A protein has these predicted regions:
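N-terminal charged helix/coil linker that caps or initiates catalytic domains
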Residues: 1-42
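Alpha-helix C-terminal capping/helix-to-coil transition sites in glycosyltransferase folds
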Residues: 38, 127-129
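Conserved N-terminal Rossmann-fold NAD(P)-binding element of oxidoreductases
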Residues: 43-45, 68
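Hydrophobic/small residue at the entry helix of a nucleotide-binding pocket
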Residues: 49
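Aromatic pocket-lining residues of Rossmann-like dinucleotide-binding sites
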Residues: 57
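Glycine-rich phosphate-binding loop and adjoining beta1-alpha1-beta2 segment
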Residues: 62, 67-105
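Conserved SAM/SAH-binding loop
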Residues: 113-122
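E1/E1-like adenylate-forming module used to activate ubiquitin-like modifiers
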Residues: 132-203
Length: 203
């Protein structure tokens, strides 16, 4: 693998992208970078968790990303959300995030959908067409519905639980849903599934 920033990676990557991801390429190699670049990713929620997730994805080489969120930027978002600054207050979050991501990689395909995921419109998102589904929704009913649907697909599925009012980042862990502890949101979701006598498919 060449260490020259402009050396050919693939016809799929623009010359600019080859320069942007040069250091990532040195770290993970051509094959992994191609896999990352080919992923079709959909992210639900671009608030305090999802907005930073979106930026990390694009900086890591994800080039096809759909953003879904119905909210507009509020002044109270400024302390913790990537799209929130005083000048962006009142603007549609997914549009602000899209602009930010295209400033990072102008050649990326970033789709912004100003909508809320819910049972009534769930079918419109065609989850089976994505390789990765990320849940950063903070409303219980919509989150539960997305978990049930996403776990029925072949996609890699990641769901963010709750970290509100928590101060120790060293205690954040990645765990199987039924094993998550110390999280009121995860507990509420498990109780909701038990009451409904349904369970997400294990991934």
């Amino acid at each position: 693998m060449s260490s020259t920033p402009g050396s050919s990676l693939s016809a799929d990557f623009s010359e600019r992208e080859q320069q942007i991801f040069h250091r990532t390429r040195l770290l993970v190699g051509d094959q992994v970078l191609h896999r990352i670049g080919d992923l079709r990713v959909i992210l639900f929620g671009v608030g305090g968790v999802g907005s930073w997730c979106a930026e990390s994805l694009v900086r890591s080489g994800v080039r096809r990303l759909t953003l879904v969120d119905s909210d507009r930027v509020s002044i109270t978002n400024v302390n913790r959300q990537m799209p929130a600054t005083v000048p962006t207050v009142g603007r549609v979050k997914v549009e602000v995030v899209r602009e930010r991501l295209l400033a990072i990689n102008p050649d990326a395909e970033i789709r912004a959908v100003q909508d809320i995921y819910c049972a009534e419109n769930a079918e419109s998102f065609a989850l089976d067409t994505y390789d990765v589904i990320i849940d950063a929704i903070d409303s219980l009913a919509e989150k539960a519905h997305l978990i049930l649907r996403a776990t029925q697909t072949s996609a890699l599925f990641v769901s963010s639980m709750g970290a509100a009012l928590k101060m120790d980042p060293t205690r954040v862990q990645i765990a199987e849903f039924w094993k998550v502890g110390g999280c009121p949101l995860a507990r509420a979701l498990r109780n909701k599934f038990k009451r409904a006598k349904t369970r997400p498919k294990r991934k």
